[in-house]
Amino acid sequence: MASVQWHSRSRKYDSEWQASRLEVSAVEFSDYHPLKAITVTDSKSRRGGRKGSTSSSSSSSSSVAPDPLSSMLDGTDPLSLFAAASETPTLPHSVSAGELGRKRKEKEEEVGLDFEPWSSKRGEILSRFTTTEKLSINLFMGSDTSKASSPSSAVSEKVRTRLEELDDLEEGSQRELLNLSQQDYVNRIEELNQSLKEAWGSDQKVKALKIVIQCSKLLSDTSVIQFYPSKFVLITDILDTFGGLVYDRIWSMCADPHPLPESFSADDVNDTAKETCLNWFFKIASIRELVPRLYVEAALLKCNRFLTKCGIQETLQRLTAMIRGIGDPLVAVYARAYLCRVGMEVAPHLKDSLNKNFFDLLASFRQIHGDSVQNQLVLQRVEIPVYLTLYSPAINWILQCVAYRAPEVLLTEMMDRCKKLGNNALLLNSVMWAFRAEFVATRATDFIGMIKDCDEAGFPKHLLFASLGRSLSCADPPESERLSILNEAWKVITKVRSPRDYINCAEIWVEFTCRHFTKREVNTVLADIIKHMTPDRAFEDAYPQLQSVIKKILTYFHDFSMLFSMEKFLPFLDMFQKDSVRVEVCKSIMEVFIKHQQEPTRDPVILNALLHICKTMHDSVNALTLDDEKRSLALLINGFIRMVSFGRDFEQQLSFCVEARATFCNLEPVIIHLIHTVNQLAMETGRVMKGNHSRKTAAFVRACAAYSFITIPSLTNIFSRLNLYLLSGQVALANQCLSQADAFLKAAVSILPEVPRSISIEGKQRSSESFLLDFINNFLSTLLVVPDHPEQGVLYLVRGLLNMVQDYTWEDNSDAKVRVYISALPLLAAMSQESYLYTIPKVDSNETLYGGDPKFIAEINKLCETLIGQVLDHLKSLGRDEEVRRQGSLAFSLFGCLLAHGDLRNNKLNQLAVNLWNLSHKHGICDTRTSVRTLEHIKHQAQQTDMSHFSDMTARLSLQSRA
């Protein structure tokens, strides 16, 4: 292809803009509405009505509903019909209204989501009640008497074998393991649980029962008393597993021919399932010892549903009475807790048995202080306060079950009964744990009186106040009593000598203080905490509680001016001396500030405090810090910077950014945000001055440009630098800082060779080519308004950019360089126009500097010819079969550029355009729809004045089918 002489097409942007605007036409709405049902009228009258009228006024008209979906409906929503059908299921005639009422009542009494399940308490008990003492356990080893009889055995032999199995339940081969550590003990219990499942899976039901009995016997043993609550949790897990296996087994026997409904009755159960169920209960009845018999039967409580209607209720009453025969009060209270747990799962509506368990507990409460217990504690060297805490999980659970949705009258009665007991601190503690927070809060003063009457030696009063504080953090006491409640509580808390006990209690009451009082009271509480936790660096062992204190304060105090004016708040933060904890606390403070600070601030108290907090976060960054953590910290610091505003005091704002740059130099996203902030500051200054800068504001925007120019090179990300150089150059131009803008743009061009061929994005290597092309296109669009430097040559920035593109090492088999050349042609064509498409106010671009000087136009044309020559040479080199697609795409791109920006009245340029069209369609790989639309556009353009040459060209452009 021969070289051509370039001529830019003359553009009249205003007239083109007007011609391309959409036509505005008035819309007559009348009675029309797009959602209104359409009625087609067949009118016999021929009077001049509008075509397609929706009027239905004709006397002899027939309405037709053309919407096929509407015609299928009779006016009723089909989804509503389905919903109505599902809400009113067909009921069998045998179900009476009374039965429905009973079931509805039971459903209302079912345990809801507001009931804290046992599973949530399990982990806390296991972690709290530990021991270093050695433990022992009896492992079941199996027995030879449980061999399966042959099919030919007589019935009498089966009976005899069954009796032998029952006798062997407690006398099977056992192995006692001594001197086990706590972890070994837990592992052995887990082995038993696994053995139970394996025995059941292999149809060795009797062996499974023996394992459960042996495990249940362990609950009679209190030789290592501190571990008993954890032992209870582990053993009852096995009991729960066993109960579930037996229930599922009997349920499956009822599935023939139809599975049982969820709300089945004993009448729905077949005889085989009932017989199997009875057989299990007969086996359990043969267990000689009370404790294992009680626990195993409780585990199978749900199976009573298969036998009789009232079986569960009767069994609960009987087992409740049986517990009275257990002599050890600790064993008895946990047996009651298990019975209440199973009862709440199986029949939560049977409240009487729950209440009976509680009142029986009260009746036997004095046993705790009896001689036998005291002797046992002396033998095991356990103090009374420690011993009493062993009861807490069981009593708390019993009271939680009893108090759940209980009427106020019952709760009041239970509280009165607790008052009548001597040494009732343990019960009082559980009452405050388990009763509704609203109930406790309204009687807070009464509870404080009861706490005062308790014996300090038996149960520490600070634990009682801690339990009271938990309730008061969820519900509010009467307003008139709040101050006296806080004073009474803090009198006790501040006297606690153990730092651990003190902070555990103080942390709870901080929420009550923040919830109901001002910063004065909160400051006093913080001062007291600092006083108690500073000696011997006790705070180092209480970081979780101290963090909780901070979070509670931040929950209720969102006025940071008030918060940082607290005398003791920052000294309190100084107690967090472990780096990781300190950073977490700082992050929580910043998160609350960003979330709740509504207006930008210039308060020096807030700024100094938050700057210190952000610096703490920033200084935690090191070479090992993960990228996600860096992003998280940068996000919080940027949120702080965004909320700092000095109003019209722009110089103070810039000074803050200078200080922030020095403080946060290790976090690149923060530096980038600061550059954006300063650029925004310069633009805001220009907006205030309405583009007419005074000497002072002109100096200020130059200072902003200097800030950005100095800061950008410190960034490591090459594309961040490129984009910020370009953006800062645009800001400088907008504020008439021409030399600064020139420096920014030259700096951007100078670092183009540093762009790597691939970059890491989210841990993956990706080609940088597409990002570089995007940047260059943005850069080219800016160059239209940048005036040439008087000491440099014509179009020196454009030439510099193109030279860098020429020398850049592009990827192999890449067309990126040629695409940049094609992208530069519209810029050069726009520069040759008499008036530019866009300009910057008060900045003289090249249209003013050169005023259409023929030498300037000649330089542009010469550069365009060079670029087109480079593109054509590249197209010639793409001759191989595998390159024709790239060749066609580039040819079509250059054709579009010539069509839009070249003067096609020039015959050579016109012929080049036709050749490019033919080349792009030569192999039939060009998008047909795009080609058709392009031809239509050319034909439309040909209809305009001085565009007749398009008609001749259209005749020479043909569409070729795909090969």
Curated annotation (Swiss-Prot):
Keywords: Endosome, Protein transport, Transport. The keyword Transport applies. Component of the heterotrimeric retriever complex. Belongs to the VPS35L family. Residues 38-71, 85-111 are annotated as: Disordered. It comes from Danio rerio. It is found in: Endosome. Coiled coil: none annotated. This is VPS35 endosomal protein-sorting factor-like. InterPro entries: VPS35L. Residues 52-63 have a biased composition (Low complexity). One of its GO terms (cellular component) is endosome. Its main location: other. It comes from the Eukaryota. GO terms for biological process: endocytic recycling; protein transport. The gene is vps35l. The lineage of its organism: Eukaryota, Metazoa, Chordata, Craniata, Vertebrata. Acts as a component of the retriever complex. The retriever complex is a heterotrimeric complex related to retromer cargo-selective complex (CSC) and essential for retromer-independent retrieval and recycling of numerous cargos such as integrins. The recruitment of the retriever complex to the endosomal membrane involves CCC and WASH complexes.
